[in-house]
């Protein structure tokens, strides 16, 4: 697959790049994508949820009333799960949600995600550019020139660029990261994937 390289003004630069078929033209493995995305979202969970049982809740050492003669059901503690202020039966306890996915499955999922975007025509390549200072306005202008100002965009750079990353931090519709850091979820959670030209080589090195 070939794509025309765009300038920051949104025009064609006259240059053409060839996307590798094994990364951008592969058969989409929905199961690999499912496993990887499920793992990514599960691993984000902290698992710090906790409720107290009747043994942990404060108080309740005293018998609320005598055993016999009141007409009520017998009670041994004011912190019984049946009473207001009592402990919780089978409540949540802290535990991890981590799910392991093999490296080959992760790589297959990322290739599937890129291939899906390529099939839908949602991959753009822009010439390598740099910003002189951290400012949102010039970066927003570039997105507008490319027709991405109102679309959820994942922008991939060849390496971490603090100026570009921080310039786009205030723009809610754009997510900027170095190419090798992009996960399957990041790719699928965007409308368009915008590559800086040099970032394509990084992807080929990572997934090739």
Curated annotation (Swiss-Prot):
Q: Which segments carry the region annotation Disordered?
A: 45-96
Gene3D superfamilies found in the cross-reference section: 3.40.1370.10
Highest taxon of source: Bacteria
- InterPro entries to which the protein is assigned, alphabetical: Ribosomal_uL4, Ribosomal_uL4-like, Ribosomal_uL4_dom_sf
**Pfam families in alphabetical order:** Ribosomal_L4
**UniProt keyword list:** Ribonucleoprotein, Ribosomal protein, RNA-binding, rRNA-binding
GO MF annotation terms = rRNA binding; structural constituent of ribosome
* Keyword field contains Ubl conjugation: no
Q: Does the keyword RNA-binding apply?
A: yes
Comp. bias (Polar residues)? 69-80
**Assembly:** Part of the 50S ribosomal subunit.
Similarity comment: Belongs to the universal ribosomal protein uL4 family.
Function, as annotated, reads: One of the primary rRNA binding proteins, this protein initially binds near the 5'-end of the 23S rRNA. It is important during the early stages of 50S assembly. It makes multiple contacts with different domains of the 23S rRNA in the assembled 50S subunit and ribosome.
Name of protein: Large ribosomal subunit protein uL4
The record lists the organism as: Chlorobium phaeovibrioides (strain DSM 265 / 1930) (Prosthecochloris vibrioformis (strain DSM 265))
């Amino acid at each position: 697959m070939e794509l025309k390289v765009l300038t920051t003004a949104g025009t064609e630069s006259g240059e053409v790049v060839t996307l590798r078929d094994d990364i951008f033209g592969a058969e989409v493995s929905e199961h690999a994508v499912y496993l990887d995305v499920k793992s990514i979202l599960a691993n984000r969970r902290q698992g710090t949820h906790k409720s107290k049982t009747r043994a942990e809740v404060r108080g309740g050492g005293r018998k609320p009333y005598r055993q016999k003669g009141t007409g009520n059901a017998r009670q041994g503690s004011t912190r019984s799960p049946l009473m207001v202020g009592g402990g919780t039966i089978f409540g949540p306890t802290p535990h991890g949600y981590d799910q392991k996915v093999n490296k080959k499955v992760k790589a297959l999922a990322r290739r599937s995600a890129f291939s899906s975007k390529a099939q839908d025509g949602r991959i753009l390549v822009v010439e390598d550019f740099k910003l002189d200072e951290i400012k949102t306005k010039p970066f927003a202008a570039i997105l507008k020139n490319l027709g991405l100002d109102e679309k959820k965009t994942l922008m991939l750079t060849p390496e971490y660029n603090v100026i570009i990353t921080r310039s786009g931090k205030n723009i809610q519709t754009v997510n900027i990261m170095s190419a090798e850091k992009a996960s399957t979820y990041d790719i699928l959670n965007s409308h368009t994937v915008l590559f800086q030209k040099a970032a394509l080589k990084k992807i080929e090195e990572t997934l090739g």
